[in-house]
Amino acid sequence: MSNPCQKEACAIQGYCLLSHQYDDAKCAKVIDQLYICCSKFYKDNGKDSRSPCCPLPSLLELKMKQRKLTPGDS
């Protein structure tokens, strides 16, 4: 697995942000999908695993809490 969650990360920058003139509020659902993917990645591979597409586990946990997301959301 070379870059877990790359599809979700690219959807944010490559499509959503460009389409909405970099207004991240309009991309909330796509950003949530990335965070959920990253949460699953860390759950499956351990918190010492890394992906250039995912924030570090401690930051991811904070972001998910701020957005009221749980790892089982989809």
Swiss-Prot record:
Protein name: Cx9C motif-containing protein 4, mitochondrial
Source organism: Saccharomyces cerevisiae (strain JAY291) (Baker's yeast)
Domain remark in the UniProt entry: The twin Cx9C motifs are involved in the recognition by the mitochondrial disulfide relay system.
Keywords: Disulfide bond, Mitochondrion, Repeat
Sequence similarity: Belongs to the CMC4 family.
One Pfam family per UniProt: CMC4
Motif (Cx10C motif): 5-16
PROSITE patterns assigned: CHCH (PS51808)
Motif window: Cx9C motif: 27-37
InterPro entries associated with the record: CMC4, Cys_alpha_HP_mot_SF
Residues annotated as domain CHCH: 2-45
Disulfide cross-links: 5-37, 16-27
Compartments where located: Mitochondrion intermembrane space
GO cellular component, one term: mitochondrial intermembrane space
